[in-house]
Regions:
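Bacterial N-terminal signal peptides
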Residues: 2-13
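Conserved active-site-adjacent core of cysteine acyl-enzyme catalytic domains
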Residues: 15-30, 48, 61-189
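N-terminal targeting signals for Sec/Tat export/insertion, comprising classic cleavable signal peptides
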Residues: 26-54
């Protein structure tokens, strides 16, 4: 049941045990459009809704509304949401939260295990931006993201994604529900 709820869709023709051998994956993560400067809150909402839908107990994981999430994350110190606030908010809901400097192999590893990631993208001097990575497609050399400022399943050129991600020191957040036992990622995020 969990496998069908995760709705992993293979984008390529091969599916191997090694995430590096696959042509691509996509996770059906619900989309939430952001209000001004609330990409972090929208990203948290997407992650919470994803795990709510994927829960084997029929959605027993409670999902706060987007306005409640935004209120819980709003900062008087910044025009947006700090990554540390997202981590603390998810932890307050008893999620297992890991923030780490990601690498491309981390994206492939976690997505192939049914775990969407929130990543920070640099914006050339403007405010940084959070998106939810939902997949990748090697033949097209793209990363699939839910961009709360734009739309679901936005295709980003992998090279441009990497450059933008590096502007935030490859900031990555993995949030797992309390019902999912998991060991902490290693120092390289796995």
């Amino acid at each position: 049941m969990l496998a069908s709820l995760l709705m992993l869709v293979v984008l390529g023709s091969s599916l191997g045990a090694d995430p590096g051998a696959e042509a691509g994956f996509w996770l059906d993560v619900p989309f939430v459009r952001q209000d001004k400067n609330l990409c972090g809150a929208a990203s948290v909402s997407m992650i919470l809704q994803y795990w709510h839908n994927a829960s084997p107990t029929g959605g027993s994981i409670e999902v706060p509304s987007f306005p409640d999430i935004a209120e819980g994350l709003r900062s008087s110190e910044s025009k947006g949401v700090f990554g540390s606030q997202m981590k603390a908010y998810l932890a307050s809901l008893r999620y297992q939260v890991f923030v780490f400097k990601g690498q491309w192999e981390d994206v492939k590893n976690h997505i192939s295990k049914g775990r969407p990631l929130v990543v920070g993208l640099g914006n050339r001097g403007a405010l940084d931006h959070y998106v939810v990575v939902t997949g990748w497609n090697d033949p097209e050399n793209v990363v699939l993201v839910n961009d709360p400022a734009q739309r679901k399943l936005l295709k980003l050129d992998r090279k441009n994604f990497q450059k933008s991600w590096e502007q935030t020191a490859c900031w990555t957040l993995l949030a797992l529900p309390p019902s999912l036992p998991v060991a902490a990622p290693t120092s390289d995020g796995r």
